[in-house]
């Protein structure tokens, strides 16, 4: 057996204690061991089943899987994505990486600032709206940033359109006036079918509205400027980012342009600085002192010792309502793998299903299952100390009290002679407490999740930076639409029923 397989066996043999016993045994020591403050964010793992024995086992696993070496490769611009023979340099966009990559990112950010200056100076006419067209990582990040941080900004109206369903574009067209709209097409390859179809429809919308030089209203955010120029966008209106920045890690690059335009450059710079602070922590902290690695330890306990197939994230803050959807792609597209780095079948469970919602709404929808269902679901709560409104304090006090009470109730449960009213308890939760939802704190929070994903990938021995699993369905959709592939009778019958002959 290898050292890694020994560690996995030790985890299988490890016996978890009841949460209430763990917390009651030595509360001060537990808080010291499982609560961290990084970048003005409090990460509280005290209500998880982690104990000293589990942490020691998983620390041995991290060493066996060369966590230190893979982390160094990540930050030095080495081949962190071996299946595509690429680096993974999203941290360089925040100033932490190979010097040449950091300099390239700084040059890109300067071009972004110049583009914003040009828009504000009227180079594209009187622009009031930005229609951002992308999908996946080219849309989820910008949408999250603008929705979370743009509540008090009146700079520009931004609509992020990702779905190829024409209703999505129709909705944006209804809100915007063509003569005052700029269109950003975001695609790493500039070959994404849905994005280009939406871009062509937006071009037609501008043309039919009588906009002079409609293609001149387009800018491109891409790692393939040649394809963007072939589509018709002038080189001066292309903001190119590096191929070594993965789509779901790209909001720090020109993909984040909608946020920089809508919020202002200072806010975008604060976002980068918050992420950079988390980068420094992840790069320098070792073992369980590293909050991203500690979080991965908890993830592996639940996925590969206690058999949890899902993980729920609930943001008790309306501004973070899009965060669960963002994390779904980040976590499941990164670590939803079944093959290790050396091509062997993965013996452990990979990423669980990530899902969630916003509190307190979710309490009236899904918490029944969390408290009394037969599935054990680790829950993550995210809440801020400071509200973003001027309403009565009772609003925020009630919100925070509900968030904290849910974690306590999941852990403690409640006995009852009436089984229908009994709560089994011993259900784990993590609480992430922000001082406030700001560009800096959101940058740090997103970077925490990125590095947590990477730490989990190291423990599992998988590559978190490829996504070959998304290709087959797209290829088959193309063949089905074009009629160039023979499909099974059931699929042919369904296609005929949906679209006719």
UniProtKB/Swiss-Prot annotation:
Location in the cell = Cytoplasm
Write out the entry's keywords from A to Z: Cytoplasm, Gluconeogenesis, Glycolysis, Isomerase
Q: What class of enzyme is it?
A: isomerase
Name any one GO molecular function. monosaccharide binding
Q: Where is the signal peptide?
A: none
Q: Where is the composition biased (Basic and acidic residues)?
A: 86-97
Q: Region (Disordered): which ranges?
A: 78-101
GO biological process: any one? glucose 6-phosphate metabolic process
* Annotated catalytic residues: 333, 364, 474
InterPro entries per record:
G6P_Isomerase, G6P_Isomerase_C, Phosphoglucose_isomerase_CS, SIS_dom_sf, SIS_PGI_1, SIS_PGI_2
Q: Which domain of life is it from?
A: Bacteria
Catalysed reaction equations from the record:
alpha-D-glucose 6-phosphate = beta-D-fructose 6-phosphate
Instruction: Give the metabolic or biological pathway.
Output: Carbohydrate biosynthesis; gluconeogenesis; Carbohydrate degradation; glycolysis; D-glyceraldehyde 3-phosphate and glycerone phosphate from D-glucose: step 2/4
The main location class comes to cytoplasm
Q: Which Pfam families match?
A: PGI
Q: What is its EC number?
A: 5.3.1.9
Cellular component GO terms, alphabetically?
Answer: cytosol
- Give the family this protein belongs to, as stated in its UniProt record: Belongs to the GPI family.
Stated role: Catalyzes the reversible isomerization of glucose-6-phosphate to fructose-6-phosphate.
Q: What PANTHER family does its record include?
A: GLUCOSE-6-PHOSPHATE ISOMERASE
Protein name as catalogued: Glucose-6-phosphate isomerase
**Lineage of producing organism:** Bacteria, Pseudomonadati, Pseudomonadota, Alphaproteobacteria, Sphingomonadales
